[in-house]
Structures are given as C-alpha cells and as structure tokens.
Amino acid sequence: MTGYLGLGSNQGDRLATLRAARASLERHEVTVTAGSSVYETAPEGELLDQPDFLNACVQIETALAPEPLLDVCKQVERELGRVPGGPRHGPRPVDVDLLLLGELEHRSERLVLPHPDITARRFVLEPLLELDPGLTLPDGTELSGALDLVADQRVALVDTL
C-alpha cells in the first residue's frame, strides 16, 4: 500500500538525521519509493525559542497496517536519538509522522489517519505535493487546494533528501 510520511529535525546535523531516517525505514518492512526536497521552517506552537526545523516527506510502499507502521515510525525515532515524552512542538533530533496510508481512514488513541494537521502545515503540504501534485485525502479533498490557506507560513527550499 502507498503511504506518505513526514520527516522533521531541529537538533544536531538535521539533514544527516533526515537522510538516516529515510535509510532506517528501509530496514523495517517499508520501501521508500520517493523523497521530497528538504525545507527549512520556523518552529510553531507554544515553544518558539528553538532552532528552525528541516522537513521533508517520503512516499512509501508497505504491507503494514496503520498501527504497526506507527510502531516502525516510533522505532526509527528512538534509533536516531529521540526520547519519548518530550514537550509537544518541542525540539527533537527527529520526528517521523504517518500522514496518509492509501485511502485508509483510521482513528485510535495512538493514531488518526489522515494526519489531522495535514492541511494546516505548509511544511507538510509543500513536500507532499512535490511528490504527488494530485494527491487527495480519502474523502476526495485535493491537498493542493489547502496551499492557499497556509501561504503565510514560511518555508525555504534548502536541499534534497
């Protein structure tokens, strides 16, 4: 099944960490079929006094169901130095978010698919639409239509994944 993951980092060698996350996914029943460009973005939320983030997205193929795929995402984060339980929107060596998985809609205590903030974050939309300009949510909503709503959010293209 085709899915999309968001990658982020704002501690250490951010670009190397994103590339390591991409490589690590391949060791966990996930095939990365495409990677977006890397974008630099300012922190958001209640903790703004921290370094800028680098963000990217990857397109994947996997036979994993949503919850086991989330476990893989959390395992990759731990492998790359993230300690569970840090503050929401706080600094982190790596973040691996499950954004979309096929046409699945999923809701549990641990996971909501599609990711509930997917249309509110330009640092997610830009790389996602780079991978698939016609990408839609399971309800048919075209993600390209959400870009106008987040046009005021700063993102800067910095590298490739």
Where in this protein do the model-derived segments appear?
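N-terminal beta1-alpha1 ligand-phosphate binding loop
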Residues: 1-29, 36-42
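Short, structured patches in soluble enzyme cores that scaffold and shape functional sites
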Residues: 7-9, 62, 129
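Flexible, gly/pro- and Lys/Arg-enriched active-site loops
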Residues: 29, 44-53, 64-161
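A short, local hydrophobic-aromatic micro-motif
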Residues: 33-36, 126
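Short basic (Lys/Arg) and small-residue
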Residues: 58
